[in-house]
Amino acid sequence: MIQPQTLLNVADNSGARELMCIRILGASNRRYANIGDVIVAVIKEAVPNMPLERSEVIRAVIVRTRKELKRENGMRIRYDDNAAVVIDQEGNPKGTRVFGAIARELRELNFTKIVSLAPEVL
């Protein structure tokens, strides 16, 4: 469950290290975002000499949350951190690598490029 003002780690090599959620895209008054939701975020920490800089507003898709994700078969999956992948306007990742495991639900939400870059899909 990600809400505005939540800090997230960045799970790719786009140049950003930490994001802060400022808006959840979708309905006009969504309170929380889960895995697979697109958010508007601001970069709080960035790697020097990279295209993305601090205080830049970007879009990202959430790939891991500490709040457990309940699947239809009854299984619950929980990760150690809140993480997102930086995307462009078309939904393609800005980085060329994705770090850490991501949820299988991203494939059903048409983020297949992110799923193909991930080392592990749970």
Swiss-Prot record:
UniProt-listed Gene3D superfamilies: Ribosomal protein L14
Gene Ontology CC annotation, any one: cytosolic large ribosomal subunit
Biological process terms in GO annotation: translation
SUPFAM superfamilies: Ribosomal protein L14 (SSF50193)
SMART domains reported in the protein's UniProt record: Ribosomal_L14 (SM01374)
Known role: Binds to 23S rRNA.
Entry protein name: Large ribosomal subunit protein uL14c
Organism: Lemna minor
Lineage: Eukaryota, Viridiplantae, Streptophyta, Embryophyta, Tracheophyta
Gene responsible for this protein: rpl14
